[in-house]
Amino acid sequence: MPIIKVRENEPFDVALRRFKRSCEKAGILAEVRRRESYEKPTTERKRARASAIKRHAKKLARENARRTRLY
């Protein structure tokens, strides 16, 4: 749980922004969304595998695009 100490004479919106940023860095909202509903382990693995495949395809596309620009 992120802890924010409000500095003296610090506006509330600035402190709130710092708190939101620290929550984002800690990954709290992503964790809450992930735990909102149960996901079967097979579905979770399938989703993770699909995202890995997509990442790999993106990486290959970037490398191919870079190669074509070199010539």
Swiss-Prot record:
What PROSITE patterns does the database record attribute to this sequence? Answer: RIBOSOMAL_S21 (PS01181)
Which family does the record claim for this protein? Belongs to the bacterial ribosomal protein bS21 family.
**Which ranges are annotated Basic and acidic residues under compositional bias?**
60-71
Which gene is the coding source of this polypeptide chain?
Answer: rpsU
Q: Which UniProt keywords apply?
A: Ribonucleoprotein, Ribosomal protein
UniProt-listed InterPro entries: Ribosomal_bS21, Ribosomal_bS21_CS, Ribosomal_bS21_sf
Regions that span the bilayer: none
Location of region: Disordered: 38-71
Reading the lineage from the top rank, the first entry is Bacteria
Q: Is Lipid metabolism found in the keyword set?
A: no
Stated name of the protein: Small ribosomal subunit protein bS21
Record-level GO BP terms: translation
Query: Locations of Basic residues compositional bias?
Result: 46-59
List the molecular function annotations (GO) for this entry.
structural constituent of ribosome
GO cellular-component term (any):
ribosome
